[in-house]
A protein has these predicted regions:
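Nucleotide/phosphate-binding sheet-loop regions of phosphoryl- and nucleotidyl-transfer enzymes
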Residues: 2-389, 418, 424-427, 434-439, ...
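C-terminal accessory/binding modules appended to enzymatic or scaffolding proteins
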Residues: 18-21, 401-443, 552-554, 831-849
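Short beta->alpha connector loops at strand-helix junctions that form conserved
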Residues: 46, 450-452, 471-474, 580, ...
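Long, charged amphipathic helices and adjacent flexible linkers at domain junctions
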Residues: 68-72, 228-233, 369-419, 424-426, ...
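Conserved alpha/beta-domain cores
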Residues: 97-98, 519-521, 526-903
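Structural motif
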Residues: 242, 410, 427-429, 448, ...
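A short, small-residue-rich loop immediately preceding and capping a beta-strand
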Residues: 445-451, 469, 555, 853
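Residues forming the flavin
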Residues: 465-467, 481
């Protein structure tokens, strides 16, 4: 470091930052600074940066300069507040809270009331004039500190608290008086000493330092890592730590705490949404332990604070130009803002809010497009419950996260995971969820809680994950020990089927039938976005999709093998077929003909088998070209190894053995068994398949090309506009392609001469082997188009057999952070993506008009679509149901890049 360079700054006062410093200050710290800048009532405090956390996580030690920086900021805070941290007569108390760049609700740690001790609790009694409040605050500190910082089992504190209420004959915490709470503090301290092997620290600075380290450590807890993996948040960002002077919502009926949203995060509708809890501290609301009142009720409880809060909500939404999620506390009639962030929302709310903000003039259409994503659109396409179905209503709660979920009732996360892994669909049912339930929530189809509101842990996390959730179903009594729920006389045991409607909050016994969502009906053309019965969600989706289609460069095709799928794809907005797998045309009743081809001993037998297949293939192609008239249809010639068309070797062996034992041997079965043995390969994925089949079995590819050409000619003569493209699979060298192309050109010429048509059929190849990608410049000499088969390219680049590795070690790789996400789900940009990028450049250098597409499963993956836009592909191809997602993401990619892609 040079003499003129400032040493790295690890601590920022709330007056120093702004909302654009999320990388450094985390979301919470950046937004506290922003609210401070706006002149809103924020308790004074400071933020320790994510850089300090990274140093700690990398080295195991805090940065050397951190303690002095924290001391300087603490001194400034004490001067401003005119009191010292934990002083015995008039203590300053602080909270220590996590705050990563991306919101991770409930995943990391918070400790409130730091600075309380046996001495300073007496000072807090004098300061507040409320003995019960002071001892309750001390009790909460020991409980939170013990669990979070010292690793004491939280259930031990809860059990002691329940026992105290039972002894007193009360059911809620607030009915315990100061004497009860003093006893509880003694008990809690004993629990800490016994379980943590040390006394609860009485030095306030030691409390603060240990809490800061605990927040740093909470970045790498199992639940935080699991959440990051689920939400695709990088693991190296670290968390900031916010040290904030305490304000108290538990000082009596004129105090309280709440969470507010500037719009309904479940539906997107404008209005006053949120939860409020009188005489409580902040964590009580989010934990869902006590049922809250609606935020609108605050108007009758404390109109002055309510009016001030509504004005602040309007200020924040206008400033952030988005739905804001706000945490606040009222201390004896004075409102304090503890946090704001752009709020998590459901998929439907995201689309509605984006278009509402355009109509209000706060954002433009390009920004609205960035406010939604393909994963949200996919959620909107899931089915909903049939309103006409006969149902048995169990109960009703708060509609926290929409969707229609059906599954077997389970009452803990372990069972949810276990049953889900064995293929069962489950509904996780709890009194309330906590961060330790995250893996169970991920495994479940839906979540049901008997406590908590729209801002509880279950609701916030479920909305973020797109999971169906109903909260606060108070009439449902959940018994986790006996693993059952009870509503009146109805008992639901673990394993019984229940249906949860996150859009209405209703819970049903048994399985309720589902119907297509309105969004799917819109894409299918059965609902017009401007029709009277079209809801505002469909109208919002239509507006955003129309803009995405206007700005995108990437075209979107479908993977479809028959006319029915092709027609559906076209309704969904497909601009052609990027992959028609001809092997799917050889299944069912036609399998016998393929068997004859495989068993052929002479040229004559083989030609006869091919002649039988030709008209069937041709008829399939005619239907396909008619369905996609005027749009390109890329037909892949036969790709899989031949043994896939033959009976299973074990079943066939048993059949032959049984027949021989009965002296009733079947000649055809014997020949089939010999063929199965002959064609058996140790690694069929890398064996006789793709172009190799066409080179080894004379006439196979010629028959397929003839069927394509004759079908195209017939459509042309019927005044159609067929645009067939012939794709050769698994090419590794240009010589393979040249030999097949020569044969194909000859067949096409024969068909053109016989039918008097000019077909203009393009011939290209799949790029699915590393050698093909590395020699793309040579292959482009014989190919008019490339289509990247990223499924096989991923397998061959990584040396993976997908079916084997996903069943064996993928989970371990994800847990160890070797993968952030499966490379079969999202394109591996560094490896596979690098080959795609170089093949694009080399191919276009040889043939500037080379058409480039991708037809692997990555074609419908949102993140991968952005990569394919960036490298300059012409189109992506995906399953029909994913087409709207690909269209949306292609638009988002174009709007983000502003012409930066390689086209």
């Amino acid at each position: 470091m040079s003499e003129n360079e400032d040493p790295q700054k690890f601590v920022y006062d709330f007056t120093e930052g702004n909302k654009d410093l999320k990388d450094l200050l985390g979301g919470k710290g950046a937004n506290l600074a922003e609210m401070t800048n706006l002149g809103l009532p924020v308790p004074p405090g400071f933020t320790i940066t994510t850089e300090a956390c990274k140093v700690y996580l990398d080295s195991g030690e805090e940065p050397a300069a951190l303690r002095d920086e924290v001391s300087a900021h603490l001194d400034a805070l004490e001067t401003r507040m005119a009191k010292k941290l934990g002083q015995s007569d008039d203590p300053l108390l602080v909270s220590v809270r996590s705050g990563a760049k991306f919101s991770m609700p409930g995943m990391m740690d918070t400790v409130l009331n730091i600075g309380l001790s046996d001495a300073s609790v007496i000072g807090l009694v004098a300061q507040s004039g409320d003995e019960r409040f002071a001892w309750d605050s001390y009790r909460r500190l020991i409980q939170m500190f013990g669990k979070t910082v010292l690793g004491v089992d939280g259930d031990l504190f809860e059990e002691a608290l329940e026992a105290a209420k039972e002894a007193k004959g009360v059911s809620v915490d607030v009915d315990l008086d100061a004497a009860d709470l003093k006893k509880l503090v003694k008990q809690f301290k004993k629990i800490v000493t016994r379980d943590a092997g040390r006394d609860f620290p009485q030095d306030p600075r030691e409390q603060m330092d240990l809490a800061i380290k605990a927040v740093f450590d909470s970045w790498n807890t199992d639940r935080a890592k699991l959440y990051r993996r689920q939400e695709r948040i990088p693991g190296d960002l670290g968390t900031a730590v916010n040290v904030c002077s305490m304000v108290f919502g538990n000082l009596g009926p004129d105090s309280g705490t709440g969470v507010a949203f500037t719009r309904d995060p479940a539906s997107g509708h404008q209005g006053v949404y949120g939860d409020y809890l009188q005489n409580a501290q902040g964590e009580d609301v989010v934990a869902g332990i006590r049922n809250t009142v609606a935020l609108a009720d605050l108007e009758s409880i404390d109109k002055k604070s309510y009016d001030e809060l509504i004005a602040i909500m309007e200020t924040l939404e206008t400033h952030y130009k988005d739905l804001c999620d706000i945490e606040f506390t009222i201390e004896r009639g004075r409102l304090w803002m503890l946090q704001t962030r752009v709020g998590k929302r459901t998929a439907g709310a995201a689309f509605r809010i984006a278009t509402q903000l355009v109509d209000q003039g706060l954002i433009d259409e390009a920004e609205a497009l960035q406010r939604v994503n393909g994963a949200q659109l996919a959620q909107l396409m899931f089915p909903r419950f049939d309103d006409e179905a006969e149902v048995r209503l169990l109960g009703r709660g708060i509609a926290a996260s929409p969707g229609a979920a059906v599954g077997k009732a389970v009452f803990d996360s372990y069972t949810a995971i276990k049953w889900s892994r064995s293929g069962e669909k489950v509904i996780l049912i709890r009194r309330e969820t906590n961060p330790d339930d995250l893996d169970g929530m991920i495994a479940a189809e839906g979540i049901l809680t008997s406590r908590g509101g729209k801002t509880s842990h279950a609701a916030v996390v479920a909305r973020g994950m797109g999971k169906t959730c109903v909260c606060g179903a108070e009439e449902i009594e959940v018994d986790t020990k006996r693993r059952r729920l009870t509503v009146g006389a109805t008992v639901v045991e673990e394993g019984d089927l229940v249906s949860v409607d996150g859009s209405t909050g209703k819970v049903y016994l048994g399985e309720v039938p589902v119907v297509p969502s309105p969004v799917v009906e819109y894409f299918e053309g059965r609902m017009h976005a401007g029709a009277d019965d079209a809801d505002e969600l469909v109208a919002a989706v239509h507006r955003i999709m129309a803009y995405a289609d206007r700005v995108r460069r990437l075209r979107v095709r479908a993977n479809a093998d028959n006319a029915e799928d092709a027609l559906r794809a076209r309704r969904f907005g497909a601009q052609g077929i990027g992959l028609c797998r001809t092997e799917h045309m050889f299944l069912g009743e036609r399998r016998e003909m393929v068997e004859k081809l495989i068993l052929a001993d002479t040229d004559q037998e083989r030609e006869t088998a091919l002649e039988q297949l030709l008209p069937l293939q041709k008829a399939d192609f005619i239907e396909l070209f008619e369905a996609m008239d005027g749009l390109p249809v890329t037909v892949r010639l036969l790709d899989p190894p031949l043994h896939e068309f033959l009976p299973d070797i074990t079943e066939l062996s048993v059949r032959v053995a049984l027949a021989e034992s009965r002296k009733d041997a079947n000649e055809n079965d014997l020949r089939l068994l010999q063929a199965v043995h002959r064609l058996h390969e140790q690694n069929p994925m890398l064996g006789l398949r793709g172009v190799r089949l066409g080179l080894v079995i004379p006439g196979l590819f010629a028959m397929q090309v003839r069927a394509i050409a004759e079908a195209a000619a017939e459509r042309k003569n019927a005044k159609g506009d067929p645009r067939a493209e012939i794709m050769i699979p698994l090419v590794g060298t240009v010589q393979e392609l040249e030999i097949v192309r020569e044969e194909a050109d000859r067949v096409i010429a024969e068909v053109q001469a016989a039918t008097g048509t000019n077909l203009k059929l393009k011939i290209g190849t799949m790029i699915e082997l590393p050698r093909a990608a590395l020699t793309a410049g040579q292959i482009a000499e014989a190919a008019e188009f490339f289509s990247f088969g990223t499924n096989d390219l991923t397998q061959t680049v990584w040396g993976f057999s997908r079916d084997d590795v996903e069943a064996s070690f993928f989970t371990a790789y994800l847990e160890k952070g070797i993968f952030g996400v499966s490379p079969f789900e999202t394109i591996d940009k560094d490896g596979v993506g690098s080959l795609v990028r170089s093949a694009v450049a080399a191919g276009r250098a040889t043939r500037p008009d080379l058409k480039l597409g991708i037809c692997g499963e990555h074609g419908g993956d949102p993140e991968s679509v952005h990569f394919f836009h960036e490298v300059g592909l012409d189109y992506v191809s995906c399953s029909p149901f994913r087409i709207p997602v690909a269209r949306l993401e292609a638009g988002r990619a174009a709007a983000q890049s502003r012409g930066s892609d390689s086209r």
